[in-house]
Amino acid sequence: MASSTLSPVTQLCSSKSGLSSVSQCLLVKPMKINSHGLGKDKRMKVKCMATSIPADDRVPDMEKRNLMNLLLLGALSLPTAGMLVPYGTFFVPPGSGGGSGGTPAKDALGNDVIASEWLKTHPPGNRTLTQGLKGDPTYLVVENDGTLATYGINAVCTHLGCVVPFNAAENKFICPCHGSQYNNQGRVVRGPAPLSLALAHADIDDGKVVFVPWVETDFRTGEDPWWA
């Protein structure tokens, strides 16, 4: 006596998380031949092999990895840079622009940078991160004579976009990702980075530091700004 086998069917299985996954089920009705040659039915058996896909695997995790890399980079590079400002603070949506068309510089707490107060706590030669144009981490520079430089230095490496810490001991910016180096004004002196760090004007408006896009000649290279 021939046995009957049903074709595989597709079943929607539910997981504990409420998500569903497709599984293939095979329904078989086996026959058993006894000593008298008679067929005896057994219960219908259903074998279901489900392949569940975790929810996290369904969502691209590139953004999550990038964010964690940025935060980790900041934590690892702080001892090298000798700074107390966590880089993660600066990866927030940029604030509204100032009335003059510039972007107010923000400190690690998100407060406006008051030039006179900044100079009281940052000595000559200091380079400290603030939030600049488009929310980019940007260094405010204190000149050797104790005045605030009229330019800010974008901290994003021109190689692959890592945040570059300032190494005060060597008086230059050194990227921890692939070893690119820039002098204390952000001009590239060693690859693989192909270009110098971008600049922004650092103006003072009503006592506050304001960043304005730099579209003039790059004073470090004598060339047009590649970022404009």
UniProtKB/Swiss-Prot annotation:
> Per the UniProt record, which residue ranges are transmembrane?
72-92
Taken from the UniProt record, the cysteine pairs bridged by disulfide bonds within this chain are: 162-177
Q: Where is the transit peptide?
A: 1-49
Q: What is its subcellular localisation? A: Plastid, Chloroplast thylakoid membrane
- Assign the protein's first listed, main location to one coarse class: plastid
Cofactor: record remark: Binds 1 [2Fe-2S] cluster per subunit.
Q: Which GO terms describe its cellular component?
A: chloroplast thylakoid membrane; plasma membrane
Which SUPFAM superfamilies is this protein grouped with?
ISP domain (SSF50022)
Q: How does it sit in the membrane?
A: Single-pass membrane protein
User: Required cofactors, per record?
Assistant: [2Fe-2S] cluster
List UniProt keywords, sorted A-Z.
Answer: 2Fe-2S, Chloroplast, Disulfide bond, Electron transport, Iron, Iron-sulfur, Membrane, Metal-binding, Plastid, Thylakoid, Transit peptide, Translocase, Transmembrane, Transmembrane helix, Transport
Domain Rieske: residue ranges: 115-211
Recall the GO molecular function terms of this protein's record: 2 iron, 2 sulfur cluster binding; electron transporter, transferring electrons within cytochrome b6/f complex of photosystem II activity; metal ion binding; oxidoreductase activity; plastoquinol--plastocyanin reductase activity
Query: Which sites bind [2Fe-2S] cluster?
Result: 157, 159, 175, 178
User: Which CDD domains does the annotation name?
Assistant: Rieske_cytochrome_b6f
Q: What is its EC number?
A: 7.1.1.6
- Is the keyword Phosphoprotein in the record? no
Any Pfam family: TM_PetC
Protein family (similarity comment) = Belongs to the Rieske iron-sulfur protein family.
The misc remark on file is: This protein is 1 of 2 subunits of the cytochrome b6-f complex that are encoded in the nucleus.
**What role does it play?**
Component of the cytochrome b6-f complex, which mediates electron transfer between photosystem II (PSII) and photosystem I (PSI), cyclic electron flow around PSI, and state transitions.
Q: How does it assemble?
A: The 4 large subunits of the cytochrome b6-f complex are cytochrome b6, subunit IV (17 kDa polypeptide, petD), cytochrome f and the Rieske protein, while the 4 small subunits are petG, petL, petM and petN. The complex functions as a dimer.
Show the NCBIfam families listed in the entry: Cytb6fFeSPetC (NF045928), PRK13474.1 (NF010001)
Protein name per its UniProtKB record = Cytochrome b6-f complex iron-sulfur subunit 1, chloroplastic
Gene name of the encoded protein: petC1
